[in-house]
């Protein structure tokens, strides 16, 4: 804009304020607004995260797809877990304690695969111990079961243990170890502040059976979610992944011995069948009881004339060939007939 020029002899114009004046509230309204305060609701988790349990879940190389899916299911159900790459078979088990220290974890679930068909699970309190070694059997993953139950990811579970865990000392030790590993710490940053599922550990046939159920709000019924697996205890060690043996399961049978027993049972069945066949063959070859001759059978018997026995000392003479060499084809013979 061009500058405004004032005319000669005229008074200067008073500057006008273009902004609108704010409406001033009355005294009573000002006091009412001053008394009102905007209150921000507090967070859902008012407590402090004190239990710093962290569980490292990983495996060795050579596991199959079912074990990998089970490992992923456990990671999704345990918000306080951490993952790690697979460990080489050449490395010894003491290396796991160093991995836990680097990952800032004080508990560990380690899956060890052997012969591409046997799966072992280590539950350890790193680095002091104790640790337990299990044989994992009857694995069923979440994707495989397709149960109707469901739970929110990150929610805290209720741990339910069989009463048999309090009767024997080795099971009491395992109960405390399982509680510290599978129990989600309260006020954990990744956890949800409510409970909607339950982990059950029951003892049957000298094994620990794991199940996961959803708690329905309406009638407090239980609906299974998954996964499923069975833990067959092998040994409990004083240290982490080694050390003096505190307990050894007398009922444990190694997978190699189990497969050997199956092969021996199959071989015994085959051998038994062969022996039965030989006995039946011997019975057939034995002399049968002599039946007395019936005299009426030879009534109509007529003896045949005895023919002299001829022994040929020379080969027979060759027969003459009657085949015509000048035999024409059928087509030529038919052509001659037409002519």
UniProtKB/Swiss-Prot annotation:
<comment type="similarity">
    <text>Belongs to the BRX1 family.</text>
</comment>
<keyword id="KW-0690">Ribosome biogenesis</keyword>
<feature type="domain" description="Brix">
    <location>
        <begin position="53"/>
        <end position="242"/>
    </location>
</feature>
<dbReference type="Pfam" id="PF04427">
    <property type="entry name" value="Brix"/>
</dbReference>
<feature type="compositionally biased region" description="Basic residues">
    <location>
        <begin position="320"/>
        <end position="339"/>
    </location>
</feature>
<feature type="region of interest" description="Disordered">
    <location>
        <begin position="304"/>
        <end position="339"/>
    </location>
</feature>
<dbReference type="GO" id="GO:0003723">
    <property type="term" value="F:RNA binding"/>
</dbReference>
<dbReference type="InterPro" id="IPR007109">
    <property type="entry name" value="Brix"/>
</dbReference>
<dbReference type="InterPro" id="IPR026532">
    <property type="entry name" value="BRX1"/>
</dbReference>
<feature type="region of interest" description="Disordered">
    <location>
        <begin position="1"/>
        <end position="34"/>
    </location>
</feature>
<keyword id="KW-0539">Nucleus</keyword>
<dbReference type="GO" id="GO:0000027">
    <property type="term" value="P:ribosomal large subunit assembly"/>
</dbReference>
<dbReference type="GO" id="GO:0006364">
    <property type="term" value="P:rRNA processing"/>
</dbReference>
<comment type="function">
    <text>Required for biogenesis of the 60S ribosomal subunit.</text>
</comment>
<dbReference type="GO" id="GO:0019843">
    <property type="term" value="F:rRNA binding"/>
</dbReference>
<dbReference type="GO" id="GO:0005730">
    <property type="term" value="C:nucleolus"/>
</dbReference>
<protein>
    <recommendedName>
        <fullName>Ribosome biogenesis protein BRX1 homolog</fullName>
    </recommendedName>
</protein>
């Amino acid at each position: 804009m061009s500058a405004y020029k004032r005319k000669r002899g005229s008074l200067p114009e008073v500057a006008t304020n273009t902004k609108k004046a704010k409406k001033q509230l009355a005294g009573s309204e000002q006091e009412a607004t001053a008394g009102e305060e905007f209150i921000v609701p507090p967070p859902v988790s008012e407590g402090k995260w004190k239990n710093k349990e962290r569980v490292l879940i990983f495996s060795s190389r050579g596991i199959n797809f079912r074990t990998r899916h089970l490992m992923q299911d456990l990671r999704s159900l345990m918000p306080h877990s951490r993952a790690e790459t697979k460990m080489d078979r050449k490395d010894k088990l003491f290396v796991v304690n160093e991995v836990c220290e680097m990952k800032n974890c004080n508990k560990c679930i380690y899956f060890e695969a052997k012969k591409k068909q046997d799966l072992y699970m280590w539950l350890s309190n790193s680095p002091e111990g104790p640790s337990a070694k299990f044989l994992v059997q009857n694995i069923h993953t979440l994707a495989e079961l397709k149960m109707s139950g469901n739970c929110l990811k990150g929610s805290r579970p209720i741990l339910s243990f069989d009463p048999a865990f309090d009767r024997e000392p080795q099971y009491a030790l395992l109960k405390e170890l399982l509680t510290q590993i599978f129990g989600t710490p309260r006020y954990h940053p990744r956890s949800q502040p409510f409970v909607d599922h339950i982990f059950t550990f029951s003892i049957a046939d000298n094994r620990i059976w794991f199940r996961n159920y959803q708690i329905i709000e309406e009638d407090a019924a239980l609906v299974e979610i998954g996964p499923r697996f069975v833990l067959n205890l092998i040994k409990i060690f004083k240290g982490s992944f080694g050390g003096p043996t505190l307990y050894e399961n007398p009922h444990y049978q190694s997978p190699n011995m189990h497969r050997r027993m199956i092969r021996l049972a199959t071989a015994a069945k085959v051998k038994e069948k062969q022996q039965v066949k030989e006995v039946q063959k011997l019975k057939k070859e034995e002399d049968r009881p002599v039946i007395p001759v019936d005299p009426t059978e030879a009534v109509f018997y007529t003896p045949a004339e005895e023919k002299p026995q001829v022994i040929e000392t020379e080969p027979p003479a060759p027969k003459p060939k009657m085949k015509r060499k000048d035999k024409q084809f059928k087509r030529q013979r038919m052509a001659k007939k037409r002519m």
